[in-house]
C-alpha cells in the first residue's frame, strides 16, 4: 500500500524539506524538472528531430518547473519553446529565477499558441494548490491546448484538477501522461481527475515522509493481494470460516446466490443462506454447496456462523426490517463481524436508531444512491468529495464504510482511508455489488485463523475491494467490458487468488 497525500500534506512535506532539512526550493524544483524531462525523453528520444515541444507555464512554482523542463530539453537538443500565462507581477521568486536561467540558455518564448504545429505540450500552468474555478485567459489557454493534436504531459497534476477531490475546476487540461512528485495526490485517484491525468508516474524528487505529517490515505496495489493468507494445510471447512448470508426476499434469490458465490470463490469453508421459502428450490439448484435455512430460528443461525452478511435483495418490508434489526442487534452483542449491504443499508437509512448496533467490526458497502439515503445528501454533493463523505460516515457510525464508485473508497472509523484503482467499467453491472459483499465476507474470514496476523477491519475490507477489482479486470480481459456479468467476477476472484 502506497501513501497518497492531500494538497495540504504535500505543502507540509515540501516545507519540511526546505525549512527543516535545509534543501533549497530551487534544488527541489530542479529535481522535479529533471524527472519530467527524463520521462519525456524516454518517449521522444527516437524522434528528437521531429519533435516540437511547447511548455505552457503559469506564474507560480509549477510554472517554474515547466520553465526548467523546457531549458533541460533544449540543452539536450530538443526544439523547445515557452508560452507564459498569467500576470508577470505575480510570479514567484523561483519562477522568475527559472525564467532568467532560461533566457541565458536562449530558450525561446512565443506569444501565440499557433506559432508552430507542436507535437508535445507540457502543462505547467497550475499545481496542486488550485482550489478556485479556472477563468479568463487561463480558461481560454487550457481550452485551446485541449484542442491541439499533440501528446500532452502534465507537471505534477493537470491544470484545473482539484488535488484533493479530483473535481474539474471549470475546465481541466486533458493529459496523456502526468508526472507527479513524491506521492500520488488524492485528486489523481478520483474521477474525473483520474481521467484527465492519463497515465500517472510518481517521480522520486527527494521529498520523503515526515513524522510531522501523519499519513491516513493509502492506495492499494496489486502486490497487496499477497497479504491475503493462504489456506493452512491442516485446516478443515470449519477452519476456513462459516458465513451466514441473510438475503433474498420471496422470489428474489439472485443477490443471495451471488453473495454466497463470491464467498465460496475466495475460499470460504461453509455458507448458510437465510432466505424466504420461495427461494429454496432455485438456490438449492444453482448452489448446492450452500446450506439453506428458510425458518426463523435466527439465534441458532447466528451462533453457528463466524461472519454475517445482511441485506442483499432482502427487501424493505416490515418483515425484512424486523429480520435485519434482529441480526444487527444480535451480531453486535455477539461481537461478530457484519457486512451490511443493499436493502440492509436502505433499512438503516429508514431506521437511524439502528446505528447503535454498528461497531468497528461492521462493514457498510453503500453505492452513491444508498450513501445519499444514509447521509441525506444528494449524489452530486457526495461526488464533490468522496473521501470526506466516506470518512465522515465511518467516524459517525464507528463502522467501516466502503463507498462504491468507479474508484472505491474504504474508510475506517479511525480515519485511515484506502483507495482502489483496480476495476473497470464492465463491473458496473447488476449483481457486482452482491459479489463484492461475498468477497468481503470471505476476506474477513481468511483472517479469523489466529495463526495469521490480524489487520484491522478497515484494512481487511480494503484488501477485499482490491481483490474484487482485480477479479473484474481479469474478467474484462477474457470477456471484454461490454459483455461482462457478475458471475464473471466470481470466476475472476478465484483466478486472482490462484495466481497470487
Regions found by a protein language model. Name each.
Residues 115-119, 172, 302-303, 357-358:
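A short, aliphatic-rich alpha-helical micro-motif
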Residues 68-146, 281-293, 299-300:
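N-terminal small/polar loop signature for handling phosphorylated ligands or for N-terminal nucleophile
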Residues 118-120, 125-215:
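Internal gly/pro-rich beta-alpha loop/helix module
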Residues 1-82, 92, 188-338, 346-363, ...:
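Small-residue (G/A/S/T)-rich helix-start motifs and N-terminal tracts that mark the onset
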Residues 85, 157, 276:
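Active-site loop/turn elements of alpha/beta-hydrolase fold enzymes
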Amino acid at each position: 500500500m502506497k501513501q497518497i497525500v492531500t494538497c495540504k500534506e504535500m505543502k507540509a512535506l515540501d516545507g519540511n524539506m526546505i525549512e527543516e532539512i535545509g534543501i533549497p526550493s530551487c534544488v527541489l524544483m530542479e529535481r522535479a524538472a529533471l524527472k519530467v524531462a527524463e520521462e519525456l525523453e524516454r518517449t521522444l528520444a527516437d524522434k528528437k528531430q521531429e519533435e516540437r515541444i511547447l511548455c505552457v507555464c503559469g506564474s507560480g512554482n509549477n510554472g517554474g518547473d515547466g520553465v526548467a523542463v523546457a531549458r533541460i530539453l533544449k540543452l539536450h537538443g530538443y526544439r523547445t519553446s515557452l508560452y507564459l500565462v498569467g500576470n508577470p507581477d505575480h510570479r514567484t521568486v523561483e519562477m522568475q529565477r527559472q525564467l532568467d536561467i532560461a533566457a541565458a540558455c536562449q530558450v525561446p518564448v512565443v506569444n501565440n499558441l499557433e506559432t508552430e504545429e507542436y507535437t508535445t505540450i507540457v502543462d505547467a500552468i497550475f499545481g496542486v494548490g488550485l482550489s478556485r474555478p479556472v477563468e479568463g485567459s487561463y480558461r481560454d489557454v487550457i481550452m485551446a491546448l485541449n484542442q491541439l493534436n499533440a501528446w500532452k504531459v502534465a507537471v505534477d497534476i493537470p491544470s484545473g484538477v482539484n488535488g484533493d477531490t479530483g473535481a474539474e475546476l471549470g475546465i481541466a487540461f486533458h493529459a496523456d501522461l502526468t508526472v507527479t512528485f513524491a506521492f500520488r495526490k488524492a485528486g489523481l485517484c478520483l474521477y474525473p481527475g483520474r481521467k484527465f491525468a492519463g497515465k500517472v508516474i510518481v517521480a522520486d524528487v527527494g521529498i520523503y515522509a515526515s513524522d510531522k505529517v501523519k499519513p491516513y490515505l493509502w492506495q492499494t496495489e496489486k502486490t497487496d493481494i499477497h497479504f491475503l493468507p493462504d489456506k493452512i494445510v491442516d485446516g478443515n471447512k470449519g477452519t476456513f470460516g462459516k458465513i451466514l448470508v441473510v438475503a433474498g426476499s420471496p422470489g428474489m434469490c439472485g443477490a443471495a446466490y451471488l453473495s454466497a458465490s463470491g464467498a465460496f470463490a475466495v475460499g470460504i469453508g461453509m455458507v448458510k443462506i437465510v432466505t424466504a421459502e420461495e427461494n429454496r428450490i432455485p438456490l438449492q439448484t444453482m448452489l448446492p454447496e450452500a446450506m439453506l435455512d428458510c425458518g426463523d430460528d435466527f439465534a441458532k443461525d447466528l451462533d453457528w456462523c463466524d461472519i454475517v452478511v445482511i441485506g442483499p435483495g432482502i427487501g424493505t418490508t416490515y418483515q425484512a426490517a424486523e429480520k435485519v434489526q434482529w441480526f444487527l442487534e444480535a451480531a453486535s452483542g455477539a461481537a461478530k463481524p457484519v457486512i451490511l449491504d443493499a436493502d440492509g443499508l436502505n433499512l438503516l437509512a429508514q431506521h437511524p436508531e439502528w446505528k447503535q448496533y454498528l461497531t468497528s467490526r461492521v462493514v457498510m458497502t453503500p453505492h452513491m444512491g444508498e450513501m445519499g439515503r444514509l447521509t441525506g445528501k444528494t449524489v452530486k454533493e457526495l461526488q464533490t468529495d468522496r473521501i470526506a463523505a466516506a470518512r465522515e460516515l465511518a467516524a459517525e457510525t464507528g463502522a467501516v464504510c466502503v463507498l462504491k464508485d468507479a474508484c472505491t473508497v474504504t474508510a475506517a472509523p479511525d480515519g485511515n482511508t484506502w483507495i482502489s484503482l483496480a476495476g473497470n467499467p464492465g463491473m458496473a453491472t447488476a449483481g457486482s455489488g452482491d459479489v463484492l459483499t461475498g468477497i468481503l465476507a470471505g476476506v474477513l474470514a481468511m483472517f479469523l485463523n489466529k495463526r495469521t496476523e490480524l489487520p484491522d477491519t478497515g484494512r481487511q475490507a480494503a484488501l477485499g475491494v482490491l481483490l474484487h477489482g482485480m477479479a473484474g479486470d481479469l474478467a474484462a480481459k477474457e470477456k471484454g467490458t461490454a459483455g461482462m456479468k457478475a458471475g464473471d467476477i466470481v470466476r475472476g476472484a478465484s483466478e486472482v487468488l490462484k495466481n497470487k
